[in-house]
């Protein structure tokens, strides 16, 4: 029996395009195991796939396939939604996500991928442990930067006295793409240089 691609990606390590050499041109992450690890560390995962006018669903329980991929209805657009419940037996300290931590990462991803639109919905409310012990209200934040890393440099230098407009250049060959943006300011900081590979901060 042929296993659907979505099931392979969620249950087998190194099954992503990063290891095929020609799977995709741009990737995010380091090891190519991300979503399969999320599945392994979750008590439950639901995946909905919309394509070719139909919607499909597959369910997982503690990393194992619970319900095979099956059609559940019609779809008027394409896309994939992954919903996961972190396993409290593994993450004994907490399974509560901090809004500010997630927002910072999504903002960074939007800066690094020019034009990418990330919409963050936090539907939690009246839960004392959600945000640093303060009650949270439902909120939505959209991250999209058409200037890419030029906008990132401007964001990092907000409030500083800058000496020039951001300088930007890029280069591309068969092995990949390099982008550089820089701007001088009157302030000094040891964190003034940042580097990323596959959208990951290399510190």
What does each model-found stretch correspond to?
Residues 1-5, 16-147:
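GHKL-type ATPase core
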Residues 6, 79, 177-181:
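Short glycine-rich loop/turn motifs
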Residues 9:
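Short basic (Lys/Arg) and small-residue
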Residues 12-13:
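Mobile ATP-lid/nucleotide-binding loop of the nucleotide-binding subdomain
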Residues 100, 108-109, 115, 119-203:
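GHKL/Histidine-kinase-like ATPase module
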């Amino acid at each position: 029996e042929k296993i659907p691609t979505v099931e392979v990606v969620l249950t087998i390590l190194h099954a992503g395009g990063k290891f095929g050499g020609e799977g995709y041109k741009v990737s995010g992450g380091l090891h190519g195991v991300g979503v399969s690890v999320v599945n392994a560390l979750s008590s439950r995962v639901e995946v909905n796939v919309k394509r070719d006018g139909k919607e499909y669903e597959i369910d997982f329980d503690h990393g194992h396939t619970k319900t095979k991929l099956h059609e559940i209805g019609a779809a008027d657009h394409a896309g994939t939604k992954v919903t996961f419940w972190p396993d409290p037996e593994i993450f004994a300290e907490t399974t509560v996500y901090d809004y500010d931590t997630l927002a910072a990462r999504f903002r960074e991803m939007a800066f690094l991928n020019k034009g990418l639109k990330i919409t963050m919905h936090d539907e939690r409310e009246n839960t004392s442990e959600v945000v640093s012990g303060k009650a949270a209200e439902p909120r939505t934040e959209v991250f999209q930067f058409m200037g890419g890393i030029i906008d990132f440099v401007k964001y990092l230098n907000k409030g500083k006295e800058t000496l020039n407009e951001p300088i930007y250049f890029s280069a591309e060959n068969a092995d990949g793409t390099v982008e550089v943006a820089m701007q001088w300011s009157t302030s000094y900081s040891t964190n003034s240089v940042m580097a990323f590979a596959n959208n990951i901060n290399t510190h």
